[in-house]
Design a protein with these regions (language model features):
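ATP-binding/phosphotransfer module of carbohydrate and carboxylate kinases, centering on a glycine-rich
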Residues: 35-172
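Glycine-rich phosphate-binding loop of actin/hexokinase-like ATP-binding domains
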Residues: 1-54
Length: 172
């Protein structure tokens, strides 16, 4: 199972055979820093075009300000503007969905998880992007993966999932 946390940034975790995969020295699954567009927006990591700059609270707010010259106070305000049908907010959300779908495609084709579970504060707005995201992922992945790969919202439970995985691992 892959867990992607959609919040201020975009984080990730991978639980494989009951163990949390955290890479060499605990730095695995920095999924938000996988490049989506090489010449894209500057990321907080210093690189350009990271997926996080397209789908995260900070990414949405920064890109909204770049496009409109107006700053928003929160991701909730960004999603409220989407609910009201604001064109710029809608375009940015759709670009974010594409970036996130491409990231998921890469993860599915690389590690073949049974599930990708989305957690974090942005999942509270799943009704605005969840179906589009699932449909786009289905379009992008190999047909065999479509038959069993589940794309699910998990709510704002990323910390709980991470702690549980660490506890399971430490018991062994």
């Amino acid at each position: 199972m892959v867990i992607l946390t959609l919040g201020t940034g975009l984080g990730g975790g991978w639980v494989y055979q009951g163990k949390l995969f955290d890479g060499y020295k605990g730095s695995g699954m920095e999924a938000g820093h996988v490049t989506y567009l090489p010449n894209g927006p500057l990321c907080g990591c210093g690189q350009r075009g990271c997926t996080e700059t397209y789908f995260s609270a900070s990414g949405f707010l920064n890109r909204y300000q770049e496009k409109t010259g107006n700053s928003l106070n929160s991701a909730e305000e960004f999603f409220d503007r989407n609910r009201k049908g604001e064109t710029v907010a809608s375009i940015l959300l759709n670009e974010g969905i594409e970036a996130l779908a491409q990231l998921c495609r890469g993860l599915i084709h690389t590690i073949n998880p049974e599930k990708i579970v989305f957690t974090g504060g942005l999942v509270y707005s799943w009704d605005l992007f969840g179906n589009s995201l699932k449909e786009r992922i289905q379009e992008l992945i190999f047909p065999i993966f479509r038959t069993y790969t589940q794309i699910l919202p998990g709510g704002n439970i990323s910390g709980t999932l991470g702690a549980a995985a660490l506890c399971m691992e430490n018991q062994e």
